[in-house]
């Protein structure tokens, strides 16, 4: 008995030793954001922002997707919960995996909100960025390689009863090894009809449940979704795949609608108008009211894609059909003759490597290019100049009453008065329609090149050219860049910084505000000759053509009256002439 008891004690001790030898299990949780070094922004969307980052531990590059919480009161977004749950439940070589979760704890002391990041492997490109890269030209074996991987990933999702609901070129990631992966499962959803899928593998189950109708980017949205169908199947993903396939051949999206109705119109022009034969019960859908007035269109898809080959046209046409029940599934597409006829799909390892191309970078460059093209215009000699802004409904100044040219400055009492000034000098806003740049002085001895221009100025001469000092000055219709010269050309009075940016038509107000310069009244007969000559020289500095035309008139007058007194009287009358004479016979051609 004692022996047996001793044996049992020894066995118990040995068992305890074995338990101590067993290694402890390490349960790995979420990492912290400080474990990664954020490098640059790769993209952004409604549900998140993606950053390129490097893990400090081993130097590997990852993509961190920050989950946006627009309203924290509603809690964690349900779309993010679905995305995390789906990515943790699936595993395929053509689907982006979820490597880790990173959190940033909220800190009330420093008023810092908490953030959650999804960590996925970094991919060098997305399909949209490659298509917009002018140095990248896809070959047909390369397109077949990408399409075969896309069909394989889509087939795996549908076999797992998962709807992606946002397949597009920007959500297809490609690395420099030629591997394509489906990403962005923010709108993905699991289908509940498991029994039907088990009995009919490869076929879309007839969904009995209503889902959200506003899914999939518009350019890749199927016609049944656009018509308001909410009991859709996996066929909506196949329509998106067909649009992506055609986009890879075309180099751009094939259906770029600006609205839902415009998108339907473009679909019907390519795939034909819906009928009971091509799309049964389409008239019962809630969105058919706006489509009834559309004209009837025949199907032109086979003609539009004929140059890409018979096999490509056959496969793409079988996918882009109006009837979702007749639409080709992913498993059927993999067995299509498109992949078994030459040229055969390329091996991913044999594909060419490219520099990083992402849709977000291309979009930023495109927006910057559009902004620059809006601000500048191309001139006749090929140079770019600043575009003169005209007033229109899109201008925030549109509808404001036109101020007087001789009114007070905009800035009064320390505030800005947009109605009180001549123009907003910080913006190139013109209060009058842009006219021809013809330079004509207000004299009775010089002819007019454009009668219409002269009549317009004659009608507005009282309001536009009459000043408080009684003198009349010509206001050239020029661009602001031509009107504002070097302040040193204005003379001693024009060197002041506060006066250097004033337009030419404000000459009299400038002299009126300067106490050192006394203006001459129209009624005064004994005008100062030196002051008048200075005014003529001042206006000539703005309008060289005015000086040339005035000298031409003075030369002809000098031939008739060679005395200097007549010449001075003629130049003085140039400034005081009250109106235009359009039927003058004097030639104003520069000599």
Swiss-Prot record:
Gene Ontology biological process terms, A to Z: intracellular phosphate ion homeostasis; positive regulation of transcription elongation by RNA polymerase II
Known EC number: 2.7.11.22, 2.7.11.23
Keyword Nucleus: yes
Active-site residues, as the UniProt record annotates them: 166
Modified residues (Phosphothreonine): 212, 565
Compositional bias ranges of the Low complexity kind: 491-502
Gene Ontology CC, one term: P-TEFb complex
Location(s), subcellular: Nucleus
Binding residues annotated for ATP, in chain numbering: 42-50, 65
Keywords, in A-Z order: ATP-binding, Kinase, Nucleotide-binding, Nucleus, Phosphoprotein, Serine/threonine-protein kinase, Transcription, Transcription regulation, Transferase
Coarse class of the protein's main subcellular location: nucleus
Basic and acidic residues bias (residue ranges): 358-372, 466-482
Residue ranges occupied by any Protein kinase domain in the UniProt entry: 36-339
Pfam families for the chain: Pkinase (PF00069)
CDD domains for the chain: STKc_BUR1 (cd07866)
Residue ranges of coiled coil: none
Region (Disordered) residue spans: 341-534, 549-591
Residue numbers of Phosphoserine PTMs: 577
PANTHER family xrefs: CELL DIVISION PROTEIN KINASE (PTHR24056), CYCLIN-DEPENDENT KINASE 9 (PTHR24056:SF233)
Family to which this protein belongs: Belongs to the protein kinase superfamily. CMGC Ser/Thr protein kinase family. CDC2/CDKX subfamily.
Subunit record text: Interacts with pch1 cyclin via its N-terminal domain. Via its C-terminal domain, interacts with RNA triphosphatase pct1 which is involved in mRNA capping. Also interacts with pcm1.
Protein name as annotated: Probable cyclin-dependent kinase 9
